[in-house]
Curated annotation (Swiss-Prot):
GO terms for biological process: GDP-L-fucose metabolic process; protein N-linked glycosylation via asparagine. It is an enzyme of class 2 (transferase). This is Alpha-(1,6)-fucosyltransferase. It comes from Pongo abelii (Sumatran orangutan). Residues 365-366 are annotated as: Important for donor substrate binding. Residues 501-562 form the SH3 domain.
Length: 574
């Protein structure tokens, strides 16, 4: 008897199991024909599952083909290993069949439905409360009005935190939290493999290259974003990024003295032809392309933020609240891999500061920004949001101490903050001194800003001004540390943006009729170019259909996710 008989039984059993699963899903679709509304809601999910299962079935088919061995002597070692893999696949197939049956038979879990109803009830009760309290305020005057208004805001905060806490638990129930962790990890590893493949060509002399010079005339956060922009264009045009950083204003030895090289195999910009950027199509036959700063970029390729890869978009929308930020964060993650000495510095600073959770990061940018790019904000304005978030955290964890990491370029601010809010702040004032204008472009200053950004990104929540590049970099890094940290911030001024980005658009989901001359009308489906959120329930933007600029209720729109056909680098998976 041939030794492959048992193996082929396994193979046939596996293929039968997959066929059964595909038949079951198809039958589910047929049975749902008498409920067309339900079917339409579930169709996209089921088709996605079906596509994944088809792919897995194809993988199994290939494995089966690889076991077709001709007559004659047989080396059973590798084959036995393949059979074991197939056995594992069979177990997984059975598990997926059972899980899918449970899902379609029982619907959502009990905890999910309990929380959903609690949130629904909380929203209704909030509305009842608002109506009642506002009616009372109409009949009050003077001190009585002030007292009642203060109590009203206090109670309103309790309502809001209750609903937000329930929403958090809803996001974790029925295995959703575990799924989100795994999906975010899988997506990150996929993108990092693709970047690593692009950056390490087998033959550097033949590789297409994109040259980026780090010495843009601005600070560290701005320069890092400049390199990220270069990297995204390189990734989109399938060119290895060559980062020129000698005589960097922060470290004359270059980027590699602080962070790991962007390539292990290709750092030489030489090639048979070189030219300045003139567009992806025109540069097709140019081996080495030099990229200008984004302000001078023409023509503009589609790969600029806030676009995300078409092949990842559906998965990103499910797992993350701001896919565009997540996509930017992947390039930041690759770029700022620290050299061993920097890793040691970070570990020592963490120990010295006593940095541990829960902790909220506060970044206050003063000096050259105030009066030009940003308004002055007193420390009290930041601390309002710090207190609010600690109260929210206390709903779901033990807050043994309210810790705040303060990062600022104003050395006098830490003393002021500690006087007004004793026992809150864990910070290093020497970093503030190094961030001052007279010390800004030194290696010590670079160490300081890197440490500040690191600790801000590690915080549970971030309070800052998004007009600051440092704050936005910290927020980007934060996205790489959690499945979805898109809501873990409060900006006192701008919404998130990437310098040089393409238009940021939203889509109206509800109609709006202006009540004042400052507002704009909207109809469902209108495209709104957003200029900013006023953090008072209203945003400002332009209705692109009407050409009118003004205010509109923020809840009446949703984000328009822009997708681009980026390369998928299948070679990275081999």
């Amino acid at each position: 008897m041939r030794p492959w008989t048992g193996s082929w039984r396994w193979i046939m059993l596996i293929l039968f199991a997959w066929g059964t699963l595909l038949f079951y899903i198809g039958g589910h679709l047929v049975r749902d024909n008498d409920r067309p509304d339900h079917s339409s809601r579930e169709l996209s999910k089921i088709l996605a599952k079906l596509e994944r299962l088809k792919q897995q079935n194809e993988d199994l088919r290939r494995m089966a083909e690889s076991l077709r061995i001709p007559e004659g002597p047989i080396d059973q070692g590798p084959a036995i290993g393949r059979v074991r893999v197939l056995e594992e696949q069979l177990v997984k197939a059975k598990e997926q069949i059972e899980n899918y049956k449970k899902q379609t038979r029982n619907g959502l879990g009990k905890d999910h439905e309990i929380l959903r109803r609690r949130i629904e009830n909380g929203a209704k009760e909030l509305w009842f409360f608002l109506q009642s309290e506002l009616k009372k305020l109409k009949n009050l005057e003077g001190n009585e009005l002030q007292r009642h208004a203060d109590e009203f805001l206090l109670d309103l905060g309790h309502h809001e935190r209750s609903i937000m806490t329930d929403l958090y638990y809803l996001s974790q129930t029925d295995g959703a939290g575990d799924w989100r962790e795994k999906e975010a990890k899988d997506l990150t590893e996929l993108v990092q493999r693709r970047i690593t493949y692009l950056q390490n060509p087998k033959d550097c002399s033949k590789a297409k290259k994109l040259v980026c010079n780090i010495n843009k005339g601005c600070g560290y956060g701005c320069q890092l974003h400049h390199v990220v922009y270069c990297f995204m264009i390189a990734y989109g045009t399938q060119r290895t990024l060559i980062l020129e950083s000698q005589n960097w204003r922060y470290a004359t030895g270059g980027w590699e003295t602080v962070f790991r090289p962007v390539s292990e195999t290709c750092t030489d910009r030489s090639g048979i032809s070189t030219g300045h950027w003139s567009g992806e199509v025109k540069d097709k036959n140019v081996q080495v392309v030099e990229l200008p700063i984004v302000d001078s970029l023409h023509p503009r390729p589609p790969y600029l933020p806030l676009a995300v890869p078409e092949d990842l978009a559906d998965r990103l929308v499910r797992v993350h609240g701001d896919p565009a930020v997540w996509w930017v964060s992947q390039f930041v993650k690759y770029l700022i891999r620290p050299q061993p000495w920097l890793e040691k510095e970070i570990e020592e600073a963490t120990r010295k500061l006593g940095f541990k959770h829960p902790v909220i990061g506060v970044h206050v940018r003063r000096t050259d920004k105030v009066g030009t790019e940003a308004a002055f904000h007193p420390i009290e304005e930041y601390m309002v949001h710090v207190e609010e978030h600690f109260q929210l955290l206390a709903r779901r964890m033990q807050v043994d101490k309210k810790r705040v990491y303060l990062a600022t370029d104003d050395p006098s601010l830490l003393k002021e903050a500690k006087t007004k809010y004793p026992n809150y702040f864990i910070s290093d004032n020497s970093i503030s001194w190094s961030a001052g204008l007279h010390n800004r472009y030194t290696e010590n200053s670079l160490r300081g800003v890197i440490l500040d950004i690191h600790f801000l990104s590690q915080a549970d929540f971030l309070v800052c001004t998004f007009s600051s590049q440092v704050c936005r970099v910290a927020y980007e890094i934060m996205q790489t540390l959690h499945p979805d940290a898109s809501a873990n911030f409060h900006s006192l001024d701008d919404i998130y943006y990437f310098g040089g980005q393409n238009a940021h658009n939203q889509i109206a989901i509800y109609a709006h009729q202006p009540r004042t001359a400052d507002e704009i009308p909207m109809e469902p489906g209108d495209i709104i170019g957003v200029a900013g959120n006023h953090w008072d329930g209203y945003s400002k933007g332009v209705n692109r259909k009407l050409g009118r600029t003004g205010l509109y209720p923020s809840y009446k729109v949703r984000e328009k996710i822009e997708t681009v056909k980026y390369p998928t680098y299948p070679e990275a998976e081999k």
